Amino acid sequence: MQFLLLIYENEERFASGFDPAEMQEYQTFGQQHASEIKGGNALQPTTEAQTVRVRNGKALTTDGPFAETKEQLGGFYLVEAPDKAAAAAKIPGARFGCVEVRPIMTFS
């Protein structure tokens, strides 16, 4: 079964750059789980985000994410795993923030 893992962390932690030890941990995670990881990436900070809504046929664009929270969506993985717990159990970012696990919908 496929799951989308949404990694939420406080992006202020990265304002002065990424900790080399954490980067190595993510690289090791990626290498160890390469057969399960189908895709993923880190995201630019929320200052680069835009929210788009279409109302009455017109696109309305606002700067930033929809919600203001202490933790922001910082990255994602698309993985193959037997269940939700197995999907997110070893994500390094779970120690600093949280990982939302969403099953991928299949259409037959």
Listing of model-derived features with the role each one plays in the protein:
Residues 1-108:
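Conserved, structured core segments of small domains
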